[in-house]
């Protein structure tokens, strides 16, 4: 990590990125941690998803992932357009096994309020890499503006450029800037799911064998079907398509150092 340590130490522009902490969406600080079921987001589980057993949370995982499937392509395009000169790298939605493991892990979400999968605020995610500090600052301005469209806003920022030398040493002086944003997609879920491609993605998900090898086919199909029915319900069709998404912003030297 010594080359990255020197790069940060010797470059005032890079160190200046430590100041980038845009204001978060009003109402978040007073209403607890950022979650997908936060009132400002609105992805609460349907009443039919009973939380007295893990079955309800299992269905909720499918519910969130199906919503993310429908929104992933629009999200990636929005970020690519907002990021200016940044090199955008899209990602697949977060995996089922990862979300289940986090919900049950004692050092993760096990003791959080149900539905615990609501803590996954990176189901939709991507990365944008910039060649220099000036273009990175401009790109972050564009991403913050994207976040603040409609009823959305900045949810949380993790600024690795603000870490002390000792803290940065724990990750070999790798630094990045990460933002979770409440994204308003400007349409209802009904409008999003009426599109042929989004509807096809959901149908493909329901027909496919379990993505998670630890999930029996029968349980996977049962819970996925229940989630799809809830997502396609009349109530959900009128709800604005809003979701917490994540974007990681990098400077090229940090990306190259990881290869």
Which stretches of residues belong to each language-model region?
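Charge-rich, low-complexity segments
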Residues: 1-120, 134-137, 259
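Long beta-strand-rich cores associated with HINT superfamily self-processing modules
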Residues: 110-259
């Amino acid at each position: 990590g010594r080359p990255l340590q020197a790069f940060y130490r010797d470059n005032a522009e890079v160190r200046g990125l430590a100041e980038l902490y845009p204001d978060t969406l009003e109402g978040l600080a007073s209403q607890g941690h950022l979650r997908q079921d936060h009132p400002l987001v609105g992805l609460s589980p349907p009443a039919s998803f009973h939380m007295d057993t893990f079955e309800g949370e299992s269905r909720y995982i499918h519910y969130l992932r199906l919503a993310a499937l429908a929104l992933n392509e629009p999200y990636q395009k929005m970020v690519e357009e907002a990021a200016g000169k940044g090199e955008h790298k899209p990602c697949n939605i977060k995996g089922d096994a990862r979300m289940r493991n986090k919900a049950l892990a004692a050092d993760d979400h096990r003791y959080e309020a149900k539905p615990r999968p609501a803590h996954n605020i990176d189901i939709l995610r991507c990365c944008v890499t910039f060649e220099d500090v000036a273009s990175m600052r401009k790109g972050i301005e564009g991403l913050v503006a994207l976040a603040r469209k409609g009823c959305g806003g900045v949810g949380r920022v993790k600024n690795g450029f603000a870490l002390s030398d000792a803290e940065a040493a724990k990750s070999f002086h790798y630094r990045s800037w990460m933002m979770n944003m409440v994204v308003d997609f400007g349409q209802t879920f009904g409008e999003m799911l009426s599109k042929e491609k989004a509807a096809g993605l959901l149908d493909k998900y329901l027909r496919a064998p379990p993505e998670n090898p630890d999930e029996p086919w029968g349980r996977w199909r049962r819970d996925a079907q229940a989630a799809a029915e809830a997502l396609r319900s009349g109530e959900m069709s009128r709800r604005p398509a809003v979701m917490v998404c994540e974007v990681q912003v990098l400077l090229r030297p940090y990306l190259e150092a990881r290869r």
